[in-house]
Amino acid sequence: MTRPHQRKDKRVEVPLLVLLENARGVTRDTSPSGAFFWTSGTYTPGQPISFAIELKTAIGKMMWKCKGAVVRTEPRDHMVGVAATITESTMEPA
């Protein structure tokens, strides 16, 4: 059984540093409306989540601060993959 295409924005596959409240991670891919990243911890679909993604720009590092919800998780070894929607975001200097 296949899932219907649910993404509204094109994903960019790029490893970027993700900062969470009590953990760090790295993105597998991201888009304006969501991100998938590997981290440690326990997450539940539907759970609210806040995270920041570090971006390196021509004018220096920026933090893309995001709020959203966990869509799904994918356990792997000692890590967990987290797919999250982004419902609010701001861009700030690091």
Outline where the language-model segments fall:
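Short, solvent-exposed secondary-structure boundary/capping segments
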Residues: R76-T87
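N-terminal helix initiation/capping motif
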Residues: M1-P32
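Short, conserved beta-turn/loop elements at beta-strand boundaries and strand-helix junctions
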Residues: P32, T73-H78
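Short coil-to-beta-strand transition motifs
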Residues: L19-N22, I59-K67
